[in-house]
Amino acid sequence: MIAIIDYGMGNIRSVEQALKHIGAAYIVTSDKEEIFRSDGVILPGVGAFPKAMDVLEEKDLVRVLQEIGRSRKPLLGICLGMQLLFEKSEELQDCNGLSLLPGVIRKLKVPYKIPHMGWNELKKEGEIALWNGVEDGSFVYYVHSYYADCPNEIVYGISDYGVKVPGFVAKENIYGAQFHPEKSGDIGMQMLKNFKGVVESWKSSQLSI
């Protein structure tokens, strides 16, 4: 069972429809016990970083997500949800994040339209489980004005928008997509299927303990 975190700032409906499409068992919740009982977690998000962290704090979900991240349970952040995984953001004000990944969220300063909205090429950097069946140079769908300034060793996908935008990051059980896999057609569905597979593998490993 995958828990989609509902904290009032997520693209819940589209993520829900995508998981339904790939046949994944899921629940939309902000209940701490349901999240802990899940086999994997998706943290979506649309909006401002400081507001999102305030809401997560109010719902006591900061602690929950930090525990999930450190438990080896698969965790996928999408768009703002990915940005929240990092140490802090410069959006509107300096604001601490979940600190599950090293790096800072910074504003895009490019000679192009902001937000970065639409389809862009994703170049793979290294191999991870979520790349199974995903061709290098596939196009994915973005909507964002900020990007992750983070160590190269956690970057597994890059798009060019005047700067090298980390489109996909990963460290152990923690994954983050700056783009929207749920809006990225067959390629996005394949990535979500792969995440579903990672979740199922983790569940099997726990049953064998």
UniProtKB/Swiss-Prot annotation:
GO molecular function term, any single one: lyase activity
Chief location of this protein within or outside the cell: cytoplasm
Catalytic reactions on record: 5-[(5-phospho-1-deoxy-D-ribulos-1-ylimino)methylamino]-1-(5-phospho-beta-D-ribosyl)imidazole-4-carboxamide + L-glutamine = D-erythro-1-(imidazol-4-yl)glycerol 3-phosphate + 5-amino-1-(5-phospho-beta-D-ribosyl)imidazole-4-carboxamide + L-glutamate + H(+); L-glutamine + H2O = L-glutamate + NH4(+)
Subcellular location, record wording: Cytoplasm
Quaternary data: Heterodimer of HisH and HisF.
A GO term from the CC aspect: cytoplasm
GO biological process terms, semicolon-separated: L-histidine biosynthetic process
Name this polypeptide is given: Imidazole glycerol phosphate synthase subunit HisH
Statement: the UniProt record of this protein carries the keyword Transcription: no
Keywords: Amino-acid biosynthesis, Cytoplasm, Glutamine amidotransferase, Histidine biosynthesis, Hydrolase, Lyase
Domain Glutamine amidotransferase type-1: start-end pairs: 1-205
Listed EC numbers: 4.3.2.10, 3.5.1.2
PANTHER family: IMIDAZOLE GLYCEROL PHOSPHATE SYNTHASE SUBUNIT HISH
Function: IGPS catalyzes the conversion of PRFAR and glutamine to IGP, AICAR and glutamate. The HisH subunit catalyzes the hydrolysis of glutamine to glutamate and ammonia as part of the synthesis of IGP and AICAR. The resulting ammonia molecule is channeled to the active site of HisF.
Alphabetical list of CDD domains matching this protein: GATase1_IGP_Synthase (cd01748)
Pathway: Amino-acid biosynthesis; L-histidine biosynthesis; L-histidine from 5-phospho-alpha-D-ribose 1-diphosphate: step 5/9
InterPro entries found in the cross-reference section: Class_I_gatase-like, GATASE, Imidazole-glycPsynth_HisH
Active-site residue numbers: 79 (nucleophile), 180, 182
